[in-house]
């Protein structure tokens, strides 16, 4: 199932059963090999989140001598603006990996005051010596849906149902399993973040020096795969409204799923 990026979340879905705070996963690699950490931060600007003292990780502290920041999927450029404004001359180069021409145009307009430092890339570089940042990137990557039904695991897919004239779910048996065992034998739906996991593996392989910070909505694995979270975390957002049905208004909704920070780390 493909998802689209969404950058204005606010409402909690019915799956939360509490709070799903904004978290950042930090992969620090001052010198290889990289060490992995997860940190939880409170309200404030993204620049403040990424300068989270007491955990030994900050954009300022991780910047190399060439002062390079690499942002993956910069949205409207808000995070880039805040970092460039907060860090000033410490940033010599701010590279943005962005494939959308429309978003590039928005970013260029917002960041025109920093134009000598900013450049755009079409793909992740083969070798990275930089501070890598991402705001609500991982939760917008495609996921697989795994459905335990009658004690048998299935992968959920989408078919066209001509009898009802619309798309519908179809479950097929699979050997795939969630990364942790789900207690109980009740029906259970969850996401498998295959693309986000592959992205992080690629990033870890290419990050020669620096750090990676990701701000997102998510949980550690024991909360993400809690037996009571039996409907998963997949949500749709459109016109400031949220629902859990990606098969309606197809193409008009942003589709997201919370992040398993344990798996990402």
Residue ranges and their predicted role:
Residues 1-72, 76-127, 146:
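Rossmann-like AdoMet
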Residues 124-265:
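Class I S-adenosyl-L-methionine
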């Amino acid at each position: 199932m493909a998802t689209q990026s969404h950058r204005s979340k606010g409402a909690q879905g019915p799956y939360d059963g509490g709070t799903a705070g904004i978290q950042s996963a930090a992969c620090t690699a001052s010198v290889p090999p990289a060490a992995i950490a997860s940190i939880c931060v409170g309200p404030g600007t993204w620049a403040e989140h990424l300068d989270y003292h007491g955990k030994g990780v900050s954009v300022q502290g991780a910047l190399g001598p060439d002062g390079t920041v690499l942002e993956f999927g910069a949205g409207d450029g808000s995070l880039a603006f805040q970092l460039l404004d907060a860090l000033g001359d410490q940033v010599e180069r701010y590279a943005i990996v962005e494939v959308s021409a429309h978003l590039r145009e928005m970013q260029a307009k917002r960041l025109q005051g920093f134009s000598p430092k900013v450049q755009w890339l079409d793909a992740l570089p083969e070798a990275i010596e930089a501070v890598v940042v991402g705001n609500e990137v991982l939760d917008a990557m495609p996921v697989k849906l795994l459905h335990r039904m009658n004690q048998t695991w299935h992968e959920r897919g989408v078919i066209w149902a001509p009898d009802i004239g619309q798309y519908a779910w179809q479950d097929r048996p699979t050997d795939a399993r969630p990364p942790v065992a789900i207690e109980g034998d009740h029906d259970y739906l969850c996401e498998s973040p295959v693309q986000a996991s592959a992205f992080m593996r690629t990033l870890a392989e290419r990050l020669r020096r620096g750090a990676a910070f990701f701000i997102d909505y998510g949980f550690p694995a024991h909360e993400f795969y809690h037996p009571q979270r039996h409907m998963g975390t997949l949500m749709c957002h459109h016109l400031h409204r949220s629902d859990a049905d990606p098969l309606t208004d197809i193409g008009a909704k942003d589709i997201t799923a919370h992040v398993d920070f344990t798996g990402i780390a």
